[in-house]
């Protein structure tokens, strides 16, 4: 059985399997591979999934992913190693050419090959904007090398150039890596983060907490969520997170 989900789904499952023995036993009984796509999966979620697997079946289930989009029909890169970490993308699918273009301090990955769309239906202007002068499709995705000394290991996701922004000071904010740092630093209490600050003087973060914050609050299990989030211990936890990331 191959199980496919987006990162938010895996986050919910990883959290539930920590305490739900029936779910953990049934869910892991037949799965041979996990596959995620749509966004980056935070390393703490990987670690939590692996902990549940080792606890229940005594080994780790293969976790893999892919990078692509509708225009690449649908994926462009895929890890070929069993030993991958969060953000690893691996190598291009056979027949696909890659071009790495320096842009805004990062490397944008661009595609050319038989699986790439020839353009947008009845959209000549959008088509012209999507391709460069060598007919490579401009993805807006940024990548780095997993190991610059061994390029056969492939590429790692480095965020979306399209979502990066500048502060009023002129400083570029690399949203993808910063979001990953906040989620990792706040685990297991942070489910997702929206990075803010476009044209402002400082970076902000809108944090979506997990139900695990209730364990910090020292309140009854049925306490209103507003009371939980305003509990001194919860506020201190997130203040410490901001301080540690500064």
Q: Each PLM stretch: what is its role?
A:
Residues 107-167:
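Conserved ATP-binding/catalytic segment of the ANL
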Residues 49, 181-184:
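Hydrophobic C-terminal alpha-helix "anchor/cap" residues
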Residues 100-102, 111-113, 159, 207-209:
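Flexible glycine-/small-residue-rich
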């Amino acid at each position: 059985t191959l199980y496919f989900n987006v990162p938010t789904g895996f986050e919910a499952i990883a959290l539930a399997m920590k305490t739900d023995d029936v779910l953990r036993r049934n869910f892991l009984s037949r799965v041979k591979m996990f596959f995620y796509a749509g966004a980056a999966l935070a390393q703490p979620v990987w670690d939590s999934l692996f902990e549940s697997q080792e606890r229940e079946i005594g080994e780790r289930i293969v976790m893999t992913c892919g990078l692509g989009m509708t225009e690449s029909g649908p994926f462009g890169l895929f890890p070929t190693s069993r030993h991958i970490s969060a953000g690893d993308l691996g190598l291009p699918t056979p027949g696909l050419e890659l071009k790495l273009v320096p842009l805004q301090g990062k490397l944008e990955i661009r595609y050319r090959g038989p699986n790439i769309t020839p353009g947008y239906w009845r959209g000549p202007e959008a088509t012209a904007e999507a391709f460069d002068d060598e007919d490579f499709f401009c993805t807006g995705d940024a990548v780095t090398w997993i190991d610059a000394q061994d390029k056969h290991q492939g590429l790692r996701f480095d965020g979306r150039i399209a979502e990066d922004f500048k502060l009023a000071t002129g400083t570029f904010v690399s949203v993808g890596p910063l979001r990953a740092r906040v989620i990792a630093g706040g685990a297991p209490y942070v489910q997702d983060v929206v990075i803010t600050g476009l044209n402002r003087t400082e970076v902000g973060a809108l944090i979506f907490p997990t139900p695990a914050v209730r364990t910090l609050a020292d309140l009854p299990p049925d306490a209103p969520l507003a009371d939980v989030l305003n509990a001194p211990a919860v506020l201190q936890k997130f203040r410490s997170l901001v301080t540690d990331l500064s």
